[in-house]
Amino acid sequence: MIRAGAAAALVVWLIAGIAPAMAHPHVFITASATFVFAGDKIAAMRVEWLFDDVFSDTVIQDHDANHDGHFDKKEIADIEAHAFTAVKDFHYFTYLWVAGKMIEPIHVRDFSARQANGLVTYSFVVPLPEPVDPRQAKVQAELYDETYFVQVDLDKPHPVRFEGAGHGCQGKVTKDAKRRYYGGVIVPDQITVVCGG
């Protein structure tokens, strides 16, 4: 194991691919999605994960090398390499559709991590293959881990935000029964971007 803490345990589990039947939530994430506009089109989605206190504490202990309560660039790069990159094999717990077609593979950029009040937040950007006008093509997103090793819940009361020219847009959250997972027990939340005009 690269490190003794939970951050490394999560990565090792992701790489090893423990069977879903053996999994249950060990890490808890409160997630939000920010749709980033370029002009009147969605160019990307920024995802934020706020971790539970137990996992946060381990990330801080493992990666805040100078114990100053802040992650510097080197520490963030260390977190990305050892406690984020392997999630690529699990779609970064992020699913995006444009006009009903899933975007595959998911690419991410601009990873960052920060800590506040003992809790760690990851942030990363998922660019769309090309900018999309949500008034012309339906844009939808879901954030979850289908193995249920990590429980991902949308932030309340602000699961969806807009940046740029997203005026008149809102994020409608519904349950997507067609994508039940973990033996059909868990029904993921689906975000649909709805824009007037």
How should these model regions be labeled?
Residues P25-F51, F55-D57:
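Early extracytoplasmic/domain-onset interaction patches
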Residues A77-L96:
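Short, well-structured hydrophobic secondary-structure segments
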